[in-house]
Structure formats: structure tokens, C-alpha cells
């Protein structure tokens, strides 16, 4: 077994050198108990996870291993990938991420080990899965194996109270619940198993446990259900409504809403959740306290057809191809082929000020005004969200789901933001904003590392100064909830630009491209931000 781990370590070093990366993995599962001489039973396989890399790098490394002559693929989906190296089974759990604070270095470079106390905790939390209807193997056989390992480990670990103290390990359990949630989401489970664990199912195994261990496990599992009730309720509701939320993405990520045409889009997405509206913005008012206001743009960049010619509104991103034509009510009327027009006579800055068509299209009616957008298909996979331009649709859908999960949010949708932030200059918008203590702008940002886990916090940009006091409050909430984040300096403006003298900040989901016909974001980051918004709304004063 050590030879296999050594070979994997060599492959990581080779992979990192060839790609100028710092990929690291960690060992977990029964191997750790065997290595520490807790159990004599030699594991049948190695369980591995990734420490600090993007999801594309994870897959690239697995593919790199499979190039070896002695490696073969046994089973694969986007999460579980089982390999055989020299006849030994290696299992990668791609969706699982463990914070480095819960790991220790092994004797092998770039390979960490889950600390034994956390491996012990994981073995206990595994009971809920093994005793659930979704467990695909012999649950009784697996339970007896788990109990044997726990009894032996308990006799050793319980000698030091620090090894079994779970009350002080909130961050670890938050990390673990997120891992469980994303795996449940991927495999279409309809509930958080930890929330519904039935202690009666353990009763038939009571005589197999060491008595003190049995009491410990009951208290341990009760602690999880009680201390993380809010987390479990939140994640459980998402799983129960997965079809609704994915359909919301499928139906609205490509719904047309260029500047000035937002009305139909907002009314269909938010329906009776809108309580006040003007041409400059839409307000969903649900909280009696004017404490936190969440702000979104509601428009997107695109083309407007006037007298049969197409002009750009907002940042240009068109390429030649198939385009869709929508009327003023956002109803699709046609698909046409268009050719991109490059106005190269003048500089890019001057070209933007000259009223020249940006597309050459045939078949646009000359007697009306239409929205013109590139045709694109929305795809929701186990890992990613793919659509046309996710700026600003993904933020709007996130805000709408917030209202479904908890009606206690105040949300302001501004209009015409893609043409010089016109919505933030509207009297209704500015009048609403002045009433609140804290402003949180939900946004996306262009990031080549879009499939790294973590929300980006905009500290400042070329139009907005920092607010370090409010920034530190937000960071504290991220850290308290074990949600990864990255501070950054923005490259453009947001709604916050015009409100920066208040307690205002922008939280962004990284995407592969902002203004593009093909934009990708990570599902993990969508739900991380969803939870953070709830925590900000509940806990910042």
C-alpha cells in the first residue's frame, strides 16, 4: 500500500511540474486507522480527496494518472472516480473538499492525511448514510464493520478527551455538511440524511457497541441535529426543491432583458414578490427592519434592433452566428443569422460613441423595436451552470431563491445598469437605499479561476473606495461559517459605486466570462453565496 501512495506522490510532483501547479490531495477512511495501528484489517482500497485546486485540475490529474501503463479506470461519474493502479483500488471523491486545518502532512510530498479525530467523527456520521434507504450495499455488513472500527478506535482515542471533543469542532461539521449536501445534490437525494436520522435504527446494534461509546454516539448525533438545525433546514429545503430551482435557472438564465426591457423578466421571475416598482427599480419589501438591502441589476447587455439595424446596449460581445429576436414583451419571434460588424476605423473608445450597427442581419422587421441576443442553451450539470451571459441573471435567480427559502429579505432590482448605472440615479432607488444600514450587491465577476471554490468579495475598484470596517464584518461571517472567499480589486463599477458612502459591499460569484455567449459558473459557489446572504441578513446589525 505504501508503494501505491509513493507512486501517487511521484505522479503529483510530475503533474505539478509539467503544469506549473501546486495540486495536493489528502488520504481519508480506513487507511488512516490501519496506519495508526488502530485496526489490523488491511483496507481494500484508498480513499482520496483534493485539497486546494479547481475542479478542472482535479479531473486533469485523474486523467494524468490514467495515462500510466499500470492504471485503469474502473468506474466514473463526475463525483466518484474509481481507478486501479497495479491491481489496487483508488477512489477519488471529486466533490469533497476538506479545509487544511483538519489535515496533517504525511511523509509524502503533496499528500496530506485527515487528522485521526476527524476520521473518527466521519466514521460516526457515516452511520446515517449506511442506515438510510439510499445506501446501495449490505447495510448490516457495513454497520458491523463500522462498529468494530469504532470500538477499537474508541478504546484508544477516549484516553485523551481532546481526541473525542466534538463541541468545539463547529467548523469541521459545517465543512462536512456542505460536502454531504453537494454529494446529495449531485446524486439527486431529496433530503439531508443527517436531519432525518432515526435513532431507533441504531437500537438493534446497541449490544455491539462499547457501552460508553454507544452513549457518546447518541450524544454526538444529537449534537449535530440540534447545533446545526439552521444549516440542515436550509440545505434540506434546497434538496427538496431541486427541480423547482433548476427549472428556474433553465427558464430564466437566457430570458431576454436588455436595458429598458426588464419589466416582463422581473414580473415573471419574481411575480407577486415585487411590492413597489418604477422604471428605475423593483423592490421586494419583506423585513420590517430597514437593516440589510440586497441589490441586483436586472438587465443584461445585448442588441436593440431599430429600423431593421442592430445596435449594442452595454459591453459588446457579439460574434457571428445564430441570434434570437424578441419583441418588446420578450416573446421570441424569430431566429436569424447575423454577421459581426467590426468598426475598426476608429479606436474602441471612439467607436463606442458612434452610432453604427454592431451586427449585419437579414430578416429583422423594420417597423418595430426588438431585442437581439445570441442563441444559447442553458445547461445545469453536477458541477456547473452554463448559459449565455450570467451577468446579471444568476444574481437575480439567487435573490429569487432567497425569497423562497426565507421571506425575510429586502431585495432591490435596479434597471438599465448596463448603460452607465442609470438605475442607481433613479429617485425611487436612491430614496429606498438611504433607508438601510447595510447594502449588499450580489454580482458576478470575470475570473479565469472560476471553478475554484469561493465567493469573491470586492474590496475596491477604479470607481469605489474601500470600507474596511464593513469588509471585516463580512469576512467574519464567512469565517464563522467556513465558507471560502477571496478578496479582489474590481475592474469595473457596480451599483455600489453610487452608494459607497454607506455601509456597502459587493459579493461576486466567479464566472468564466461576464459578457459572452458561453458563461460558466460553479454550482458550489452559487449555494455558498445563497447561505452567506442568509447569514448576513440574520446576523449583521
Model-predicted segments: where are they?
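Active-site nucleotide-donor binding segment shared across nucleotidyl transfer reactions
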Residues: 12-46, 50-53
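Catalytic cores of NTP-dependent nucleotidyl/adenyl transfer enzymes across multiple folds
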Residues: 9, 84-235
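Short glycine-aromatic motifs
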Residues: 23-25, 71-73, 274-275
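A structural signal for isolated positions on well-ordered beta-strands in alpha/beta enzyme cores
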Residues: 24-26, 47, 91, 293, ...
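Helical scaffold of the NTase/Pol beta-like nucleotidyltransferase catalytic core
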Residues: 1-27, 226-229, 233-237
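Metal-dependent nucleotidyltransferase catalytic core
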Residues: 1-8, 49-88
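N-terminal hydrophobic/helix-forming segments and targeting peptides
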Residues: 223-541
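Short polybasic amphipathic segments
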Residues: 81, 149, 154, 321-328
Amino acid at each position: 500500500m505504501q508503494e501505491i501512495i509513493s507512486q501517487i506522490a511521484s505522479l503529483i510532483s510530475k503533474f505539478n511540474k509539467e503544469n506549473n501547479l501546486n495540486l495536493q490531495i489528502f488520504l481519508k477512511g480506513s487507511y488512516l486507522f490501519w496506519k495508526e495501528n488502530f485496526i489490523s484489517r488491511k483496507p481494500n482500497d484508498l480513499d482520496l480527496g483534493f485539497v486546494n485546486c479547481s475542479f478542472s485540475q482535479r479531473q486533469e490529474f485523474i486523467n494524468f494518472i490514467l495515462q500510466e501503463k499500470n492504471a485503469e479506470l474502473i468506474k466514473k461519474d463526475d463525483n466518484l472516480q474509481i481507478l486501479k493502479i497495479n491491481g489496487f483500488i483508488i477512489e477519488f471523491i471529486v466533490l469533497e473538499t476538506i479545509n487544511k486545518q483538519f489535515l496533517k502532512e504525511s511523509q509524502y510530498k503533496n499528500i496530506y492525511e485527515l487528522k485521526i479525530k476527524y476520521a473518527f467523527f466521519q466514521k460516526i456520521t457515516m452511520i446515517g448514510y449506511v442506515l438510510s434507504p439510499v445506501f446501495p450495499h449490505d447495510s448490516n455488513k457495513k454497520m458491523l464493520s463500522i462498529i468494530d472500527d469504532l470500538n477499537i478506535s474508541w478504546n484508544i482515542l477516549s484516553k485523551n478527551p481532546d481526541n473525542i471533543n466534538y463541541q468545539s469542532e463547529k467548523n469541521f461539521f459545517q465543512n462536512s455538511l456542505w460536502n454531504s449536501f453537494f454529494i446529495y445534490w449531485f446524486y439527486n437525494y431529496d433530503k439531508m440524511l443527517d436531519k432525518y436520522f432515526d435513532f431507533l435504527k441504531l437500537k438493534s446494534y446497541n449490544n455491539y457497541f462499547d457501552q460508553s461509546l454507544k452513549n457518546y454516539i447518541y450524544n454526538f448525533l444529537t449534537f449535530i441535529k440540534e447545533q446545526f438545525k439552521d444549516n440542515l433546514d436550509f440545505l434540506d429545503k434546497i434538496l427538496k426543491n431541486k427541480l423547482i430551482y433548476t427549472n428556474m435557472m433553465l427558464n430564466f438564465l437566457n430570458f431576454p432583458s436588455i436595458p429598458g426591457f426588464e419589466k416582463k423578466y422581473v414580473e415573471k421571475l419574481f411575480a407577486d414578490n415585487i411590492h413597489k416598482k418604477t422604471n428605475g427599480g423593483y423592490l421586494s419589501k419583506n423585513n420590517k427592519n430597514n437593516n440589510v438591502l440586497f441589490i441586483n441589476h436586472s438587465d443584461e447587455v445585448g442588441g436593440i434592433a431599430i429600423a431593421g439595424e442592430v445596435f449594442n446596449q452595454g459591453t459588446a460581445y457579439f460574434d457571428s452566428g445564430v441570434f434570437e429576436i424578441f419583441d418588446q414583451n420578450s416573446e421570441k419571434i424569430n431566429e436569424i443569422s447575423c454577421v459581426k460588424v467590426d468598426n475598426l476605423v476608429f479606436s474602441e473608445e471612439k467607436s463606442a460613441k458612434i452610432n453604427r450597427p454592431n451586427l449585419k442581419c437579414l430578416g429583422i422587421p423594420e417597423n418595430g423595436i426588438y431585442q437581439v441576443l445570441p442563441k444559447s442553451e442553458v445547461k445545469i450539470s453536477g458541477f456547473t451552470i452554463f448559459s449565455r451571459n450570467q451577468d446579471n441573471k444568476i444574481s437575480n435567480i439567487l435573490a429569487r431563491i432567497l425569497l423562497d427559502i426565507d421571506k425575510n429579505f429586502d431585495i432591490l432590482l435596479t434597471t438599465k445598469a448596463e448603460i452607465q448605472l442609470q438605475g442607481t440615479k433613479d429617485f425611487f432607488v436612491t430614496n429606498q437605499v438611504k433607508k438601510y444600514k447595510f447594502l449588499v450587491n450580489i454580482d458576478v465577476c470575470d475570473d479565469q479561476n472560476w471553478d475554484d471554490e469561493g465567493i469573491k468579495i470586492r474590496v475596491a475598484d477604479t470607481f469605489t473606495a474601500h470600507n474596511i470596517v464593513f469588509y471585516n464584518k463580512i469576512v467574519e461571517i464567512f469565517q464563522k461559517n467556513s465558507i471560502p472567499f477571496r478578496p479582489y480589486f474590481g475592474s469595473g463599477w457596480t451599483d455600489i459605486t453610487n452608494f459607497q458612502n454607506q455601509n456597502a459591499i459587493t459579493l461576486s460569484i466567479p464566472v468564466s466570462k461576464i459578457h459572452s455567449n458561453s458563461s460558466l459558473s460553479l454550482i458550489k459557489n452559487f449555494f455558498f453565496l445563497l447561505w452567506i446572504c442568509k447569514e448576513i441578513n440574520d446576523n449583521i446589525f
